[in-house]
């Protein structure tokens, strides 16, 4: 799914609430991201649309806060704590996710399995 500025976005989303884990001075989320408007979208292994510059989950740490919350590799992050993530750079996304003042991160994500389930139900 790609986003065209100024056009409405239609997506099946899932809420994921991650409680950061404190390790010393750090707050750990337990996942990594890839993508962003400043990255080469043709390198994105999670989207069939090779123009999609979204932010995707590329790694989830086993037993970490993100896995416990239900985040999955390949999830596309649409929002973080109410902030639109559809047209951000990789660094902007990283900073939004790791904001020190926020111990809970509320995500809206979309994933291929959700999209396919809705499409299947519409065909039935």
Swiss-Prot record:
<dbReference type="GO" id="GO:0005886">
    <property type="term" value="C:plasma membrane"/>
</dbReference>
<dbReference type="Pfam" id="PF00595">
    <property type="entry name" value="PDZ"/>
</dbReference>
<feature type="domain" description="PDZ">
    <location>
        <begin position="15"/>
        <end position="112"/>
    </location>
</feature>
<dbReference type="GO" id="GO:0032489">
    <property type="term" value="P:regulation of Cdc42 protein signal transduction"/>
</dbReference>
<dbReference type="GO" id="GO:0001650">
    <property type="term" value="C:fibrillar center"/>
</dbReference>
<comment type="function">
    <text>May regulate a number of protein-protein interactions by competing for PDZ domain binding sites. Binds CTNNB1 and may thereby act as an inhibitor of the Wnt signaling pathway. Competes with LIN7A for KCNJ4 binding, and thereby promotes KCNJ4 internalization. May play a role in the Rho signaling pathway. May play a role in activation of CDC42 by the viral protein HPV16 E6.</text>
</comment>
<dbReference type="GO" id="GO:0015629">
    <property type="term" value="C:actin cytoskeleton"/>
</dbReference>
<dbReference type="GO" id="GO:0008013">
    <property type="term" value="F:beta-catenin binding"/>
</dbReference>
<dbReference type="GO" id="GO:0005737">
    <property type="term" value="C:cytoplasm"/>
</dbReference>
<keyword id="KW-0539">Nucleus</keyword>
<dbReference type="GO" id="GO:0008285">
    <property type="term" value="P:negative regulation of cell population proliferation"/>
</dbReference>
<keyword id="KW-0472">Membrane</keyword>
<dbReference type="GO" id="GO:0070062">
    <property type="term" value="C:extracellular exosome"/>
</dbReference>
<comment type="subunit">
    <text>Interacts (via its PDZ domain) with GLS2. Interacts (via its PDZ domain) with RTKN (via the C-terminal region); this interaction facilitates Rho-mediated activation of the FOS serum response element (SRE). Interacts (via its PDZ domain) with CTNNB1; this interaction inhibits the transcriptional activity of CTNNB1. Interacts with HTLV-1 TAX protein. Interacts (via PDZ domain) with ARHGEF16. Interacts (via PDZ domain) with KCNJ4 (via C-terminus). Competes with LIN7A for KCNJ4 binding. Interacts with ADGRB2.</text>
</comment>
<dbReference type="InterPro" id="IPR050614">
    <property type="entry name" value="Synaptic_Scaffolding_LAP-MAGUK"/>
</dbReference>
<dbReference type="GO" id="GO:0043231">
    <property type="term" value="C:intracellular membrane-bounded organelle"/>
</dbReference>
<dbReference type="InterPro" id="IPR017268">
    <property type="entry name" value="Tax1-binding_p3"/>
</dbReference>
<dbReference type="GO" id="GO:2000009">
    <property type="term" value="P:negative regulation of protein localization to cell surface"/>
</dbReference>
<dbReference type="GO" id="GO:0007266">
    <property type="term" value="P:Rho protein signal transduction"/>
</dbReference>
<feature type="modified residue" description="N-acetylserine">
    <location>
        <position position="2"/>
    </location>
</feature>
<keyword id="KW-0879">Wnt signaling pathway</keyword>
<keyword id="KW-0007">Acetylation</keyword>
<keyword id="KW-1003">Cell membrane</keyword>
<dbReference type="InterPro" id="IPR001478">
    <property type="entry name" value="PDZ"/>
</dbReference>
<feature type="modified residue" description="Phosphoserine">
    <location>
        <position position="61"/>
    </location>
</feature>
<protein>
    <recommendedName>
        <fullName>Tax1-binding protein 3</fullName>
    </recommendedName>
</protein>
<dbReference type="GO" id="GO:0005829">
    <property type="term" value="C:cytosol"/>
</dbReference>
<dbReference type="InterPro" id="IPR036034">
    <property type="entry name" value="PDZ_sf"/>
</dbReference>
<keyword id="KW-0597">Phosphoprotein</keyword>
<keyword id="KW-0963">Cytoplasm</keyword>
<dbReference type="GO" id="GO:0016055">
    <property type="term" value="P:Wnt signaling pathway"/>
</dbReference>
<dbReference type="GO" id="GO:0030178">
    <property type="term" value="P:negative regulation of Wnt signaling pathway"/>
</dbReference>
């Amino acid at each position: 799914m790609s986003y065209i500025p100024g056009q409405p976005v239609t997506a099946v989303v899932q809420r994921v609430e991650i409680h950061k884990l404190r390790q010393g001075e750090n707050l750990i989320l337990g996942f990594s991201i890839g993508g962003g408007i400043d990255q080469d979208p043709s390198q994105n292994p999670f989207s069939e649309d090779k123009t999609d510059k979204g932010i995707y989950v590329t790694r989830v740490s086993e037993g970490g806060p993100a896995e416990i919350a239900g985040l999955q590799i390949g999830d596309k992050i649409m929002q973080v704590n109410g902030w639109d993530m559809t047209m951000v750079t990789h660094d902007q996304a990283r900073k939004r996710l790791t904001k020190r003042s926020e111990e809970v991160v509320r995500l809206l994500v979309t994933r291929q399995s959700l999209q396919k389930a809705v499409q299947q139900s519409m065909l039935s």
